Amino acid sequence: MYHIFQISSEVFRAFGLKMKILLTLVFSGLLIWSVVLVSFSNDFNNQLLVATSNVSRESETPRDRLIGGLLTADFDEGSCLSRYQQSLLYRKASPYKPSEYLVSKLRSYEKLHKRCGPGTDAYKKATEILGHDDENYASKSVGECRYIVWVAVYGLGNRILTLASVFLYALLTERVVLVDQSKDISDLFCEPFPGTSWLLPLEFPLMKQIDGYNKGYSRCYGTMLNNQAINSTLIPPHLYLHILHDSRDNDKMFFCQKDQSLVDKVPWLIVKANVYFVPSLWLNPTFQTELMKLFPQKEAVFHHLARYLFHPTNQVWGLITRSYNAYLSRADETLGIQIRVFSDRAGYFQHVMDQVVACTRRENLLPEPAAQEEPKVNISRSQKLKAVLVTSLYPEYSETLKNMYWERPSSTGEIIEVYQPSGERVQQTDKKLHDQKALAEMYLLSLTDKIVTSARSTFGYVAHSLGGLKPWLLYQPTGPTAPDPPCIQSTSMDPCHLTPPSHGCEPEWGTNSGKVVPFVRHCEDRGNDGLKLFDEL
């Protein structure tokens, strides 16, 4: 019996040793597998976070997530992915660097907004004065908190351009900018200022009235000037600024130096605008001195302001990154083409298509289709791929271009891929998904290497200026034939102020506002109308 137990004991010891080895192997395997899983999970999360894993880059230099100091690092990245990721999608770093003075001014503004923004005692006190509309504020101190309210009107391109303009004015005059949230602004953009909100509270005392403000409103600045109802001894608690395409000469006096000394004393400004009015601010000598320090590269004003202010929400950023990765990231070269038809009977027009083709071929942006098929079929994988992103309400333009390079090869041997994200035929401003798609397409256009845009199009202005691109501008057709020449390349990327003051601020009303200062001149796509900032003299 003893021998049996002795044998059993040895068997168990041997079995126990094998079990230890087996368990060690199992646990080692599990440990290695868990490390692999964690690594895979982290990698997956990182890819999900950036959503740009296959973005092609020309260099391996680290991306500048704060864009030269434009952005502060005080935000949680996950709440707004685009804020710190936008620089990753651009193939080249922007040659336009923000000045140290601009960066310093933005940090100071953020502190001001935090002290005076919604929810603060200062904001509560400032709104109380709006209940006393008959009072004169000429001799009263309103403290450091003065405000300018941006009201959303017209299409998305107009809104982005005007909001940037209003913010710059706030920066110059040390006002706090508040944004009308009755439309879909919060579905499109993240909050731009840390620790506070730029959204105008819905209980704002004038909220129910501001939609009805127009040139006839008694507190409209142009109307008050006309009626001689405002001067240094008669200052109302709020003013309405009408900076629209139908502004009168008196409305446009707002840009003048002596008028600003009056406007500066008003605690609240309410603005409706549908034009990019930044160039006209440079006509004011006081503003001009400050603007020169803020923007040594004058044509980069909107470029910097847009990259600071406008960060698409995560939902919109998903539209952008998925489209970019699927259609643009693998291309050797990308071209954006934005087509806007200004016509009572909009749609697909052959002369517009002819104009686009003529422009892209003449400027060597796209190759001509080959006259005939090559005798040998090129199946090389090293052929150059050029991706063409087309944005238009009408899909027929991209379909025509796509068929052109499907039916015949390109004369250069390049592979031409044409892609249009959407073609909704009708502009549907204030419909959430429509506006989100429109914003995504503006950003996608800004990511291309070269860009062709339609004259007068605010959609196009936003896209090329955001991307730091000097566009080829398609002249607006004046009849049923394509213009000749079809387009012109701009020497400045800044947008155009489409209906600016026609005169300077001096008494001689005949002054040409395009000749007041050498770097504010008429836009290439507007003849003797419109003002634009140029660096090239």
Curated annotation (Swiss-Prot):
Provide the membrane-side ranges marked Cytoplasmic in the record.
1-20
Q: Where in the cell is it found?
A: Golgi apparatus, Golgi stack membrane
What is its EC class?
transferase
Lipid bilayer topology: Single-pass type II membrane protein
Under the heading Gene3D superfamilies, the entry gives: 3.40.50.11340
Q: What is its EC number?
A: 2.4.1.-
Q: In which pathway does it act?
A: Protein modification; protein glycosylation
Q: Which residues lie on this side of the membrane: Lumenal?
A: 42-537
**Which regions span the lipid bilayer?**
21-41
Recorded GO CC terms: Golgi cisterna membrane
Q: Name one Pfam family in it.
A: XG_FTase
Could you tell me the Gene Ontology terms of the biological process aspect for this record?
Answer: cell wall biogenesis; cell wall organization; protein glycosylation
What are the GO MF terms of this UniProt record? galactoside 2-alpha-L-fucosyltransferase activity
Q: Which UniProt keywords apply?
A: Cell wall biogenesis/degradation, Glycoprotein, Glycosyltransferase, Golgi apparatus, Membrane, Signal-anchor, Transferase, Transmembrane, Transmembrane helix
UniProt note on tissues of expression: Expressed in roots and flowers.
Where would I find glycosylation on this chain?
Answer: N54, N231, N378
PANTHER family the UniProt entry points to: FUCOSYLTRANSFERASE 2-RELATED, FUCOSYLTRANSFERASE 6
> Function, please?
May be involved in cell wall biosynthesis. May act as a fucosyltransferase.
The text of the family note is: Belongs to the glycosyltransferase 37 family.
- The name under which this protein is listed is Fucosyltransferase 6
Q: Lineage of this protein's species?
A: Eukaryota, Viridiplantae, Streptophyta, Embryophyta, Tracheophyta
